[in-house]
Amino acid sequence: MPIYFLVLKGTGHVQALAFPKSVSDCLGRVTDTEPMLQQSIEACDRVSTETQQLLDILKQQQDDSVLEIQDTLTIAAQGLGPQQRLCAALALLHEREPSIVQQYHDVVGSLSLPEMLKTSHVARSITFHSLLHYERLCTRLHYCHLQQSVHKQKPVRMPGKLRGRWWCQESEPQQVRFGQNVRKHVVSIGGVYAQERCMTTWSTYSVDICLINLSLTRDRPASVGGLQLQVYRISASHAEPSGKRVGHIRHRAGTRQQLQEELCTKKEKLAEMTVLTQEKLSEVIKLREITMASKAESVKLACLQKLVSPQTVSRVLSFSGISYNRLILFYVRQFIFGLAWSLSCQLPLAERHSLSNLVCRYYSDYLDQPSSEVSTKTLLTLALGMQAMLTTRTTYSLISWRLRTSIQTVSTGSVRWILCLSALPTQRLLAQILRNVPWSQRRTQFQIRPISMHHRPYGYQATVQHPPPQSSYEEDGRRPPTQPAHTSLLTYVCSINSEYWQLNDPENCELRSFFFLQSIESMSTPSSH
């Protein structure tokens, strides 16, 4: 399998960026406009406008992989022309963050990669990391045979382990150079054993070379803007060993086929591990999104609890002079209608059991107030209406049993739950329940007796502010309600179009504060009856 790689020189060491053949061909077709004379330090440090735009895009990202791409682009920016820097950046972006390329298509859209790199996830996964071991191995072989001395006579093997050095009988070395007209040069090495040990950040491996004829073909010799673009085709073939060293050579050295099979196996394993890593990364991203959504919901609930906190309620009591019993009566009535919405939702069974416990505690506190004039029959009517909205028979029986128990044995529960949960915007919640229920079936389906929300001893009158216009009833085919102040709140909400409550969103802080103040004002205003 031919190996194609891009070598950057000028930094004291070789920085290799491994690309598939399609990317190397794409880089080779790009013509750069920077002349060869601009090989100064200022020219190497200068970054083109297109590459700077890509670097600015990468700085805005918070992912670790994108930051690693930014460091790689900083190294690759030295000595490259603007078009070649942009191609290298585009290749890395396609490999690590393809969504960025799609998002900023106006910046990098003119220099697009071939379709093979876009569609094949295997080609994208082995572009940078998976082929790094394979590419560095071939790079070591290349520089071991090209940049060191090669002699006409047969070299001999020196004792000991030699790392990256070839010892020869003659003192006069012969350098192997490639001119622009030279297309092929064959280096034949016979009777020589060397061990090359390559240390990488991931693993350590050794390569034994013995009696191998290496053919190095330079396809495109070019040096543009300080960039040494070398595309080599590396092939190997075994020579006939000498008689005395046959057993030793076969014992210490591997064949070309074994080396290729080992490298292909490592490449396939690395590609599979890369695909698994990408799948795990997608799962982590999904878990991160769920966590952020739960945090946002917690913040929303915290804002709502500030409005109905015990401190806020005590402050309202101290400044308005409302009696505690009247405030409890108001909160209990608001909670009854809010609970009807909660039980009608598709909640899990465990949450419905916890809601049934709260129902018992609320009714206990409600009956514990000596000034309330609500009879047990009224409470049973409301309880039957709420039970009719349940979807599971088990929860229906459980709540029915607990309601009967709580009504027979009155206990003192905590009023704090009433203050924390009862100030919900119940009008909109009930409108969402009855959105898909026809007007003719709303009263017969729930079988809730209209209960007057007007109590003379307390002067409390619960009405809905700003009723919808007449046109909303005509479009829905319903009649407007008569005397909304003397009918029950549930009956009045049933007659209101749900689009009105969607337009007046109770999640708005101003509307919620207005609703809360209007409710307090309605309790403090004496009735005319």
From Swiss-Prot:
Keywords: Stress response. It comes from the Eukaryota. Residues 460-484 are annotated as: Disordered. This is Heat shock protein 60. It comes from Giardia intestinalis.
